[in-house]
């Protein structure tokens, strides 16, 4: 009877926690001016929007094949459809994590929900069209299957991780360790099924049997060196822990390492393993640590287009929540009633109070102003308004001038197909301009919207390079009130 009462109370607390998360995320949707992830979010939307017309996009490794496929039914609703997808993915991750915690016997399994859903980075990126929230859902589903001892199903699902995000290869390697410990080689081979399927599909469609390597955008970046992604300190992500996991989850994650080491030493004396500690030792920590070390090294070495983006850690946010929950569990099994009550209330309050500043959002009661999106949105809009007001894209002599830029958001706003054939194209990205002397093939009358951030970094097309082409007349300049990096200039190609 007592066990049923505990289960019922945990279920009520879980539903209340889910309602809290839904309210927090709905508030964010209402207040946000644009998606987290900026142009990357818009680009993922464009992949899903135009994939029905260009089937090759379903195998594009920048767009991430699994995510594009998942986003297809949501894309007809516009960018809001992908906001809904990521909000749903985040809520499902929270719920499935709770179910996993309950299955593993963690005390107060409902606590996984706020431990995951109120991490600052999760809060900061739920309102987006990025791949990270869906990847987090996929990862927690794998953990749930492993906790349920469905090793073959977990291995097969895990084998598709690299096609939700490229770091899936790192996670797959760590998962292979767990499968080997649990089953030796019996189920380990299942972990290669997804890679084999996509490698063969990609090779058949592209005609390149090295497609999986040659078309990987990060490998191509290393080979082509089109732009400098920057680099920084090895401990860049550790130093940003307040913005990633928040101070409480960070402390609890590190405490879990101590508890795991205590367990390892105790296992030297006792041969009977504890399932929960085995999961922390052989699954959660290897997955979490391998992901952390891989990204830290990539940023430190300035390779594979890292940019030092924090948002990638949304992928392993469920693992941080499991490890934090494991630490709380070890405290709660001491069965000190007053301590357990303080922990439950204190943890929830601490998570709520640190999530908003960590995500760089105001508290709901602090401000009624919208949460701003891309800092350069104002000058970009001024530039687009100028183009439309001056009729620069109006049809002339039976043809419509091209718009050249480096902002996927513009293609989404104008409903331009970035993958259209040359005879139907209305827009090109700025990296399409051939900067070699006499090789610029853009037709006379082409309108160019140059911004000092994406065009300069991603194309890359510096202002001096554009002017050096000698064929583009500057029509307007829109300086940013925030930073010159968000300046926008409008050019017209006056010579063929």
Question: Model-flagged regions — what are they?
Answer:
Residues 13-15, 94-121, 136-137, 153, ...:
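Transmembrane-helix signature of polytopic, membrane-embedded enzymes
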Residues 24-27, 43, 186-256, 285-296, ...:
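Membrane-lumen/periplasm interface segments of specific transmembrane helices
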Residues 52, 345-411:
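Membrane-embedded, lumen/periplasm-facing catalytic core of multi-pass transferases
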Residues 63, 124-134, 408:
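Short acidic/glycine- and proline-prone juxtamembrane loop motifs at membrane-interface regions
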Residues 94-99, 115, 134-158, 176, ...:
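Specific aromatic-rich, kink-prone transmembrane helix
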Residues 132, 161, 170, 247, ...:
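Hydrophobic/aromatic-rich transmembrane helices and adjacent perimembrane loops
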């Amino acid at each position: 009877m007592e066990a049923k009462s505990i289960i019922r109370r945990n279920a009520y607390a879980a539903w209340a926690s889910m309602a809290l998360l839904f309210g927090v995320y709905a508030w964010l949707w209402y207040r946000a001016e644009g998606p987290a992830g900026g142009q990357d979010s818009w680009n993922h939307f464009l992949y899903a929007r135009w994939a029905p017309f260009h089937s090759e996009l379903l195998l594009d490794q920048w767009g991430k094949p699994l995510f594009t496929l998942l986003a297809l039914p949501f894309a007809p609703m516009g960018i809001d459809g992908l906001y809904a997808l990521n909000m749903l993915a985040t809520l499902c991750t929270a719920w499935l994590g709770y179910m996993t915690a309950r299955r593993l016997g963690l005390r107060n399994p409902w606590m996984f929900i706020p431990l995951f859903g109120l991490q600052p980075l999760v809060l900061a990126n739920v309102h987006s069209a990025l791949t990270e929230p869906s990847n987090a859902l996929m990862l927690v589903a794998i953990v749930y299957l492993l906790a349920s001892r469905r090793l073959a199903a977990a291995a097969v699902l895990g084998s598709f991780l690299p096609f939700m995000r490229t770091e899936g290869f790192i996670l797959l390697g760590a998962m292979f360790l767990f499968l080997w410990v649990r089953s030796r080689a019996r189920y380990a081979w299942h972990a290669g099924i997804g890679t084999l399927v996509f490698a063969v599909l990609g090779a058949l469609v592209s005609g390149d049997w090295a497609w999986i390597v040659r078309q990987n955008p990060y490998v191509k970046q290393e080979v082509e060196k089109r732009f400098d992604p920057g680099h920084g300190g090895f401990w860049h992500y550790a130093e940003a822990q307040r913005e990633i996991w928040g101070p409480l989850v960070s402390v609890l994650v590190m405490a879990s390492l101590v508890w795991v080491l205590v367990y390892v030493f105790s296992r030297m004396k006792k041969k009977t393993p504890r399932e929960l500690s085995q999961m922390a030792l052989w699954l959660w920590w290897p997955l979490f640590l391998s992901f952390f070390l891989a990204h830290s090294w990539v940023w430190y070495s300035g390779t594979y287009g890292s940019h030092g983006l924090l948002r990638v850690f949304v992928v392993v946010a469920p693992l941080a929540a499991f490890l934090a929950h494991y630490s709380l569990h070890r405290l709660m099994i001491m069965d000190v009633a007053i301590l357990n009550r303080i922990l439950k209330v204190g943890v929830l309050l601490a998570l709520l109070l640190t999530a908003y500043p960590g995500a760089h959002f105001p508290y709901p009661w602090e401000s009624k102003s919208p949460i701003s999106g891309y800092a350069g949105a104002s000058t970009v809009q001024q530039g687009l308004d100028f183009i439309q007001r001056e009729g620069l894209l109006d049809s002339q002599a039976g043809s419509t001038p091209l718009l050249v830029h480096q902002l996927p958001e513009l293609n989404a706003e104008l409903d331009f197909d970035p993958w259209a054939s040359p005879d139907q194209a209305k827009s090109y990205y700025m990296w399409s301009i051939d900067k070699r002397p006499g090789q610029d093939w853009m037709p006379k009358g082409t309108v160019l919207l140059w911004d000092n951030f994406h065009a300069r970094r991603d194309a890359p097309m510096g202002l001096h390079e554009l002017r050096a082409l000698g064929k583009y007349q500057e029509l307007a300049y829109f300086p940013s009130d925030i930073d010159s990096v968000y300046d926008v200039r409008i050019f017209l190609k006056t010579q063929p």
